[in-house]
Amino acid sequence: MKEIELDRPEEKKKKVKKEKKIGYGGKKSPEENSNFLSNLTFSWADGFVIHCFRNVLQLSHLWDLASYDKSEYLAKKIAKSWEIEIQKPKPSYLRAGFRAFGKLQLLSIFLYAISVGIQFVGPEILGRMVTFVVESKLGTSTEDPNMGYYYALIMFGTAMIGSFCTYHANRISFRTGDRLRSIIVLDVYKKAIKLSNSARSDTSPGQIVNLMSNDAQRMVEVFGMFNNGALALPQIIICLALLYKKIGWPTFVGLGLMLAAIPFNGMAAKKLTETRKYLVSLSDSRVKATNEILQAIKIIKLYAWEDSFAKKVIEHRNNEIKLLFSYSRYRTILIVIISALPTAAAILVISSYYGHEKSLDASRIFSALSYLNLLRLPLGFLPIIIALGIQMQIAGKRVTDFLLLPEMKDIQQIDNPSLPNGVYMKNSTTTWNKLKEDSFGLKNINFEATGTSLTMVVGSVGSGKSTLVQAMLGELEIIDGEIGIKGSIAYVPQQAWIINATLKENIIFGKELDEERYQKVLEVCALKRDIELFPQGDSVEIGERGINLSGGQKQRVSIARAVYSDADVYILDDPLSAVDSHVGKHLFHKCFKGILSSKTVILVANQLNYLPFADNTVVLKSGEIVERGTYYELINSKLEFSSILEKYGVDENVISKKDDIDEDEDEDQDTIEKVEIDLNKDEKSQPKSKSSNTDGTLISEEESEQGAVAGKVYWKYVTAGGGLLFLVSMIFFLLETGSKTFSDWWLSHWQTESSERMESILLGEEPTGLTDDQNLGIYIGLGMAAVFISVCKNFIYYEYSVYASRAIHHELFNALLKKPMYFFDQTPIGRIINRFTRDLDGIDNLIATSISTFLTLMLTVIATIILVSIIVPFLLIPLAPISIIFFFLQYFYRYTSRGLQRIEAITRSPIFNHFSETLNGVVSIRAYKKQQENILINQKRLDDNNNCYLTLQAMNRWLGLRLDFLANLITFFACIFITIDKDTISPANVGLALGYALSLTGNLNYAALQAADTETKMNSVERISQYIRGAVEAPQIIDDCRPSPDWPINGSIKFDNLVMRYREGLDPVLKGITCEIKAKEKIGIVGRTGAGKSSIVLALFRLIEASEGSISIDGENIAKFGLKDLRRNLAIIPQDPVLFSGTLRENLDPFNERSEEDLFSTIEDIQMSAVVKSLEGGLDSKVTENGENFSVGQRQLIVLARALLRKPKILVLDEATASVDGQSDSLIQATIRNKFSNCTILTIAHRLNTIMDSDRIMVLDAGKISEFDEPWTLLQNQNGLLTWLVDETGPQNAIYLRKLAEAKKNGIDINEIMPIDNETTPKDNINTPPPPPQ
C-alpha cells in the first residue's frame, strides 16, 4: 500500500525533477548545520531565497524535514501525554499537547518577554531626547553635546536585540502550533480507521474533514500569536506603570476607561464563543451535504436533481451565513472597543494632564504617547487572541470528543495449532449499533468454515448475508457469543473498493512483486485481455473510485487483489454479481475452485447455479441461519432453501446437474480465444480506456499558478461582496489613518504653539494663535472623529466580507454542479472538498482580518514616513537607499513566499484525498491489516506539507529581521539628524517624529508580512476561482427551445452517425452508431467490456456530448434542449444503487411532487411495504449516509421505485440487477415488464435472461453496432457474437435462453417458460459437480 499511495500522479513530475538534483532535495536543512551567527540572523536561508528567485520552486527542491519535526517522532511524544490524559475524569487533548510540547513554548515566551522589556527602552530614550533638545535650545544642558548620538546607538542596539528575540520566539511558537496541527491530523486519521460502527454512523466524513482542516489549523493560528496573548496583560500593566511615572494620576483616567471596557469585552467574547460553536456545527452539516453530492454526482446529474441538492446545501450555507453575520458583528464590537481604547485613552489622559498642569511638557507628553502607542499592540491582539482562543478551545473539545469515541474491537485471533485455518462463530449475536434497539444484526449464529473448503452463503434480500460477512471481519458489535479467525484474511466487498493508483498497484496492494504469481492471478481473474486493451497495460492509472473501469473490471481487480494477497481465509461478498456470466463462470472455476482450492473460501452469492460445487451451503433468513449442509442435503429438506430456488425460478433438478458449467476446458479456452480474435481483429479500432492520457495518468495534477496572485483574483474578492461597499470601506480606512495622524500632529502643533505663547508672554508681547483650551477642544474633536471613523470602518468592512464569502461559496457550488462529468473523473473528491473546507474557511474567517490588518499597517507606515520626512527632511537622504533595499528584499521574498505557499496548498490536498479514499475502503484496509501502512502514507504526506509550512515560516522570520534592521536604521538616522539640527527643531516635533519612527520597527515588518499573508490567504480565492471558471455543461434550460410539457409522447429514439469521445484528443468510444428504436420497444444492449454499452447511456443523457452525429427522441434533436429538460424526461436504474442521507421520502421524491398515495402504491409495487411499515417513521424514517441502513438489494428496489414515480416514456437499465440476488432480480424484471409496458426500455445486462425477451438486442463491438435484431433471429447465426455470449453461459442455461428467445418470437409469455427438465444431459466435463450421495 505504501508503494501505491506514494506514487500519485501529482508527485511523479516532482520525482523527475528530484533526479536532476535541483535545490536542496535529499539534503539536511541548512538550519541544522548553521553556526551561531547564521542561526541568529537566519542567514542560512540566503541561498534558498536566491534559489527560489532563479527557479520555479518544486517540492523536490526542499531539504529533508528535521527528524524532530517529523510526525512519527511527534506521534510518540503525544501518545505518552494522551495516555496520561485519558485516565482523568475530563480528558483534554489540548492539555496533552501542552504537556508534550509546552517546554519549547516556555522558551519562546522567555525570549518574547525579553523583547517586550526592551520595547520600553524606546519611549524612555524618546523622553530623554526631547529633554536633550529642549535644554540644548535653552543652553542649560549639562550633558555631553554628543549625547544625542549615544541615544541613537542605544535605540538602535536595543531595538535589534528585541528583534532577534522576537523572531526566534515566533519561530518556536509557529513550530509548536504546527506540531499540534500535524498530530491532530494524524491522530484523527488513526481514530477514523478504528471507529466502531455506532460511532461511524453518528460521525460524517464531512465532520472528520473539518477536524483535520479547520480545527487543526486553529492550533497554528493560536500559537502564532500565543506569546502576544500570554504577555499582553503584563505588557499593559508595565505600560501603565511607566505612564504613571511620567504623568502621574491622569494615568488612572485611562486605566478607568480600560477597566470599564472589560465587561463589554467579556460579553462580546461570550457571544463569540456561543456563535462559534453553532458555526462549526453548521459548517459540518454543509460539508457533509457537499461531500454526499460529490460522491453521487453522476446519479444526481442523470436524475437532473441538481436543484434539489443545491437547495439543501444553500440552505445549510444560508444558516451558516446568518450566524457568520452575528459572529462578525460580535467580533467587530470587540475590535472596535479595543482598537479605539488607545485613542480614547490618549484623549482622556492628555486632557486630564492639561487640566491638572495647565501646560504641556513635550518630553512627558510624547513619552506618554509612545507608551500609549505600545498599548495598541497588546490591546489590538486581545480581540484576535480572544477569538482564536475561543476557537481553539472549541476545536480542542471537538478533537477530544472525537478521539474518545468507541473503537472497533479486533476480532479474536485463534492461535491453537491443532485447529485448521478458518472462521469460527459460536452462539454469536451481533448488531450494527448497540445504542439503537431497531438496529439489524445476527442472532445466535453458530458457523464454521475451515480447512480447504468452499462455503456458500445464500438468502433473500435483507436476510443478513452481508451482515454475516461484516461480523466475520469484526465490523459488528458483539452482544453475545464469540467470533474468531485463524489465519490471515482477504476480503472482496460487494461494491469494489479501488484506490487512485495504477491497476498493478491496486492488485499488489503494497506487497512485494512476485511476477509469476502476479501473472497467474491476472489469468485466473480474467484480466489479461483487459490489460492488453489499455494503452499503458497494467500501468494504467484507474482513477479515484475506479472511474476508468467498468463495474465488472473493478470487481475483478478487487478479486485479483484478494487472490494475490495469498491469505488463508477468503471472505467474498457477492463478487460475481457485477460480472458477465461467462466471466463469472471463469472466476468461479479457475479462481474460487482453482487457485484458491487449498484455502478457506466463504462466498456470498446470488448465482445459485454454483451451489452444487460448494462443500457447504448456509441459508440465512432475518439474521439467523435457518439451514446448512451440502447442496444435496438442502434440496431434500424442502425448507427455506427450496423456497429460494422456487422464487428464483430454478428447478432444483436442473441446478443439480451441470447447469452453467464450462465445456471441456481446452475446448472452452479455444472458443474464448477464437471469439476474442474475431472481436479484436482490428486492434486499432479498440476503444481506449476512458480519459486515458499518453503517460497513463488519469487524475489531473492540481493547478498551481505561477507568479504573483493575479489582480483579477483580488478583483474577484472585491466585487463578490459588492464593489461599492468595498470602496466605502476603503475610504474609511484612509480617513481613519489620516484622522489619527492629524490628531497626533495637532498635539505637537498645540505644544509648539503653547511654548510660543509662553515666550510671547515672558517677552511682554501679545500672544497669537489659539488658546490652550481651544487647542484642547480641537484635539478632543479630532480624537473622537478618529474613534467614530474606526467604528464605521470596521462595521462596514466586516459586513462586506460576509457578503463576499456568501457570494463566493454560491458561485463555487453552482459552478461545480455545472461541471462536465469528466471534471469529476479527473479531480479527486478530497481536492474538491478542500475548497469547501480549508479554502472557504479562510475566506469566512481569515481573509477579511488579514486585508484589514495589512491596509491599516501599510497606511500607517506611509503616513509615518511622510510625517517624519516633513519634520526631519535630511532623513530623505538615507531613506532612498533604505527604500531600494526594502524593495529588493520584498521582491526576493515574494518569489520564495509564493512558491512555498502554493506548494503548501498543493501538498495539503493529497492528505484529504488519501483520507477520503481511506474512509471509502476502511473495511478492506482493516481486513487486509493495512492500517499501519496507510498511517505511514498519511505521515509522509503530512511531513511534506509541514516541510513547506515550516520553511515558509522561516522565510517570514528571515524577512522580518531584515526589515526591522531597516526600520531601526530609519530611527537611528532620525536621532542623528535631530541631534545635528537640535538648535532649530521644535521639541514637540522631535517627540512626534521619534514616536512615529519607533513605531516603524514593528509596523514595517508587520506590513510586509501581512502583505505576504494576504497574498497567501488570497490563494484560497485563487484556488476557488480555478473551479469557478473552466468548462461547464450545456445550460440546464434553454428558454427559447423548451420541449412541450408532454414530450416525449411516444419514446422513439434515433441515433444518426453518433460519434462520442470522452475528451478532445482521445479516440472515439462510439464510432458512427446509427439505428432507430421504435416507441415502446424493449431493447437489450450487450457486448464485451469496453464495447461502448455504458457510453450509449452517457450520450443519451448527454453526460458526454456527441462529437459528431445526433440523437433524436420523437424526432427532436436532444442537443437543442437544456439538460434539465432532457434528463427529467428520462429515467435510469443504475448498477450501483445510491441513497442519500435524509428520509426515505426525500430519496423517492426529492422535489415533493408526488402524493402520499403514489408513494405507498409504489412501495407496494416493489414489495417493500412491510419493510417500510416496520421502520420508525415509515416514509419519513431516516436514511443514513450512503443508505447503509438498507441492504444493497433493498437499495436497488428503492431506486426502482424512483423510476416508477417518474412515469417516464424512456427507461434505461444500466446493469441494474447486477448487484442483487435472483429473487430481487426476478421481482425487478417482473415490475419493469408490468409497470413500464408503455415505455421504451434500453437494458444493459450481464444476465442474459433479463434481455432475451427484448424486442431486439443490440450487440456492440469496439464502439460499433455489430448485430441488431430480434433475439431469435440473431441466435440463428452460429458465428454471431450473441450466439457466443449465450453459449458461454453453459449448455443448460443456453438452452433455456434460446427457449426464452423462441417464446418471445412466438408471442408466448416468458413466465410460462419453465426451466428445462433433466431430459437434456450435456456431455461430461471436468467441472461437473460431484454426484449426490446415495
UniProtKB/Swiss-Prot annotation:
Keywords: ATP-binding, Membrane, Nucleotide-binding, Repeat, Transmembrane, Transmembrane helix, Transport. The keyword Secreted does not apply. It is found in: Membrane. One of its GO terms (biological process) is sorocarp development. The keyword ATP-binding applies. Residues 423-647, 1053-1287 form the ABC transporter domain. GO terms for molecular function: ABC-type transporter activity; ATP binding; ATP hydrolysis activity; ATPase-coupled transmembrane transporter activity. CDD domains: ABC_6TM_ABCC_D1 (cd18579), ABC_6TM_MRP1_2_3_6_D2_like (cd18603), ABCC_MRP_domain1 (cd03250), ABCC_MRP_domain2 (cd03244). ATP binds at residues 459-466, 1087-1094. It is a multi-pass membrane protein. One of its GO terms (cellular component) is membrane. Residues 105-391, 726-1016 form the ABC transmembrane type-1 domain. Residues 1-26, 676-703, 1315-1334 are annotated as: Disordered. Residues 688-697 have a biased composition (Polar residues). The chain crosses the membrane at residues 106-126, 147-167, 222-242, 247-267, 333-353, 370-390, 718-738, 776-796, 843-863, 865-885, 958-978, 984-1004. InterPro entries: AAA+_ATPase, ABC1_TM_dom, ABC1_TM_sf, ABC_transporter-like_ATP-bd, ABC_transporter-like_CS, ABC_transporter_C-like, ABCC_6TM_D1, P-loop_NTPase. Residues 1-13, 676-686 have a biased composition (Basic and acidic residues). PANTHER family: ABC TRANSPORTER C FAMILY MEMBER 10-RELATED, ATP-BINDING CASSETTE SUB-FAMILY C. Belongs to the ABC transporter superfamily. ABCC family. Conjugate transporter (TC 3.A.1.208) subfamily. This is ABC transporter C family member 10. It comes from Dictyostelium discoideum. The lineage of its organism: Eukaryota, Amoebozoa, Evosea, Eumycetozoa, Dictyostelia.
